[in-house]
Amino acid sequence: MAFFQTNIIFARDRSKNGKILFSISSLFYLVQMKNQYFKIFILLIICQYGLLGSLSAKSKKDSILTRIFTYPEKIKTLQAPDTVSYAYMKSSFHINKRNLLLMAVPTMYAMAHVGSRRYLEESYNKVTFLPNGKYQIDKILSLSSAGSHRLSFPAMLHYLTPNIYDVTLINENVLSPFHRQNKIYYKYTIEESADSLLKLHFKPRLKNTLLVTGEAEVDARSGKISTIQLTGEYDMIFYRLSIQMGNHGVQSLTPQNCSLTSRFLFFGNDVRTHYTIAYHLPKILPNISEANQNFQLMEQIRPEPLTSYEKMVYSELLKDKRSEEKDTTALDSVATPPKVNFVKSVLWDMIGENIFNDIHQDFGPNKAGSLRIDPILNPLYMEYSPSQGFYYNFNIRGGYHFSENSNIWLQLKGGYSFRLHQFSFWIPLIYYFDIRHNGFISSGISGGRRIQNGNLVNELRIATNNNRVWDNLNLYEFNDSFWDCYANYDFTPKIGFQAGFVFHRRTALNKVGFELINKPSVYTSLAPKFQVHYRPWGYQGPTLMACYEKSIKKLAGTNTPYTRWEFDGQYILPLHNVQSLSMRVGTGFYTDRSHNDYFVDFENFRQTFLPNGWNDEWSGEFELLESSLYNQSNYYVRANFTYESPFLVLAWTPLIGHFIERERLYLSALRVKNANPYLELGYAIKTRFLSIGAFMSNMNGKTKDFGFKFGFELFRRW
């Protein structure tokens, strides 16, 4: 009876809370039951205790997670963050294996051919904390055992500037386990520790490159995280990251110290790195431009002395430095200039590095100017689309900041289509005179774009009694070059206005047929253009656009009159967990045109000849649409929808799911002349290696085409 008496007391106590009710008469009845029922009753009581304990543990875990998720909100309302700080970073590199393929990896060219396999770098940096929670790191002083060669491995800087309370932990890709939206992707367990501290263990619910495994030391009362240990693998980098957060106030939201160990594996290449960085240091050096290879200055700011191993790595560089400082001239001797190895210093070092690596150079006072050139010959910049086949892109861009509200930018974007044997380019020059109001003047030229005009071919047929010989002479294709110049100004975040002009010169690829019927083979137009932009929710919401363009015949010697209207609306709706819904709807039409001499060429409905990766024109475009349909109809109505998610379908599958970074679903619809309607469905994935899309089209109720599109994504974020 002792057991039953205990449970009677328990039942009475619990009945006060209205959760568990037992009657004394029921218990006496159970005593008289057979032994097997008695055992069942005991088992139920034990399960009851286990369930209550499990619910209690889950409730505690949820309470701790809630405090962690809401901790930044409590801190940010108390104090504004310091916008500028200083940091010391030390990095070491150990090249276990390397081959020629390492040269194709951005910023790894020097490691591929410099003699030593061990390197050490140090830097003193100015850190600017941006309003969006990101960091901007500007190097003030640097010291490297590799001398003038670049070894900084800039892709690793993203791992050293983690934003643990944001949705994405590292470079807008790795999902943070300390954000509420990502809770569904992680499993959490709590381990009690001394005082009010506890350890929070986390691991992903699925094996994916966007998720991490690790533990954090958390204050149970406030939810403040003091230290973090995590491991993961992203972009072929296996990493182990240790983070010590700041102690008080806003600094507790950012790292105080980070230690990173990583391993990069790529087709037989094996590079190990180790980084340490200390934030929130005082300003030690004066305002000087970036200084390189200054041992004395680095010794002044180094927070801790070098280890014996690090001194050994530096020893060769120190030896060369001291030998350079010695006075080698003598009164009775003539200095002999050292021999220059032309193959190594010119072909290998200077030309080779610039071919395989991107060039990024700052210039001017306070690094106000910058120039960046993509690798000239890098197969990783090759892409493929059903309409253009294989094509290669390159990009050159530079700019200069006059002030916080004024700058100027120049860009050259080019590409070559191997199927079309066609080179296209676009060169815009943009001067921002009022950045706060998006005020700028833009002037750009473009060439190499192909456009079609079937009406002129029809006129040739009529003039020659429907002779079909013209069909095989490719007379309907023209090479379109244009120059536009316009000014833009946003009066408010909701309303903007744009005015300028557009000049087109369209030249027939085959001029013979036009000469036979005394028709010009070159068509030019000069059109004033006006645009109005309306953003009902400001810059963060949708954008609605209305455009009016009118070309006047014989204006500046032109011969192609037309009047064109276009209306367009675009919006990318951000959803939870880095998901998004991209929407675009629009229409356009011609209201005034000549009989045959005009060209159907819309600004917001045209074939793209310079695509560039997953984030450029992979949404809001028609992948399988025939080129001729862009230029046949004097009107169009379009709608494009794209849903993007990191974990949609394939990400949940074994093996292959680990490499999936993004997935997309496409739905596009179009109504033009001869296509009523045109529908296109698609599905695409993005991995560290490739972005691959499969598309299917339907025109006028019949299945038309099926095709693929892919592009190399390898090292695109480096």
Predicted feature locations:
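Gly/Pro-enriched, hydrophobic low-complexity segments
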Residues: 190, 195-296
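Repeated loop/turn-to-beta-strand initiation elements of outer-membrane beta-barrel proteins
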Residues: 402-410, 436-441, 493-499, 506-508, ...
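Outer-membrane beta-barrel translocator domains and adjoining extracellular loop/strand segments
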Residues: 269-271, 424-427, 454-460, 509-516, ...
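Residues on the lipid-exposed face of transmembrane beta-strands in outer-membrane beta-barrel proteins
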Residues: 392-398, 427-431, 485-489, 499-501, ...
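Transmembrane beta-strand segments that form the barrel wall of outer-membrane beta-barrel proteins
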Residues: 226-232, 260, 371-384, 395, ...
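Residues that define the transmembrane beta-barrel architecture of outer-membrane proteins
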Residues: 388-392, 421-425, 479-483, 520-528, ...
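Structured extracytoplasmic
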Residues: 57-197, 205-211, 275-383, 474, ...
